[in-house]
Regions:
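PLP-dependent amino-acid enzyme catalytic core
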Residues: 1-247
């Protein structure tokens, strides 16, 4: 499975798309083709969160072996990273209604579901691509993504992360969570403006030939932990499938 930019015919490997986040032309990376065998909710019913994640990822991250994917999933979703080993506990209200608890991750936000796995996907992609530059993750947030991304990437070797948030656009708790984040490789910065302003600024950085050339001279590669990155998107799809599989 390869990925292509929405703005050109450029095709890249899943690892390349994971590392770069956004295509050089500003387009999003999307699957070159979609699998014909669509996942059936009936087939997923009763399976563990980890099994559902593997069922989704196996269609799109074919650059990794099944064993590699399962190891990453096991490292991301366990009773150390989540307070409940079911990851997303489901409670049936009646035959047609269930409640999914999305708050058992390290930051109490549902963003933990995707970002816990993204860390391992990005690290594996860096190794597979033989990328020797340090990764600098630049991420915009309106609150929950920032803390979850910081927590996921804290103290990861060869990776640094900087989160930008609107100074007046997050809750006091979210601001404290980000500002007090532990880790030697994490930074946060408040901006004047809203989330869209932060996101637009980062997209200009990602697509600036001059800025990227300067970063390359310093041995740095920019990446993103926002949903523009397939490593954030497909784990999110897996969490959606988990909730739907009980219907």
């Amino acid at each position: 499975m390869n990925f292509r930019s929405t703005r050109s015919d450029e095709c890249v490997s899943p690892s390349y798309a994971l590392l770069h986040g956004l295509a050089a032309d500003g387009g999003l990376y999307v699957p070159e083709s979609f699998p014909e065998n669509v996942l059936s909710y009936k087939d997923l019913a009763g399976k563990s969160y980890q099994d559902i994640a593997e069922a989704v990822l196996s269609h799109f991250f074919t650059n990794f072996t099944a064993e590699e994917r399962k190891q990453m999933i096991a490292s991301a979703y366990n009773d150390t990273t989540f307070r409940d080993d079911r990851i997303v506990p489901l409670h049936s209200i009646d035959t047609d209604l269930s409640i999914a608890e999305l708050f058992h991750g390290r930051t109490l936000a549902f963003k933990d579901l995707a970002l816990s796995l993204f860390t391992y996907l990005l690290t594996a992609a860096k190794k597979q691509e033989k990328e020797d530059r340090d990764i600098l993750i630049l991420t915009a947030t309106s609150g929950d993504t920032g803390k979850a991304a910081l927590e996921g990437f804290k103290d990861v070797p060869g990776t640094n992360i900087m989160v930008f948030y609107p100074s007046e656009g997050v809750s006091p708790m979210q601001k404290q969570q980000m500002q007090k984040q532990e880790g030697d490789n994490v930074k946060v910065s408040a901006i004047y403006g809203n989330f869209d302003d932060a996101q637009s600024f980062l997209k200009r950085v990602f697509t600036s030939a001059e800025v990227n050339a300067y970063a390359n001279e310093k041995g740095v590669l920019f990446s993103s932990a926002n949903s523009i990155n397939i490593g954030r998107l497909f784990p999110k799809v897996a969490s959606s499938q988990d909730r739907k599989s009980v219907v």
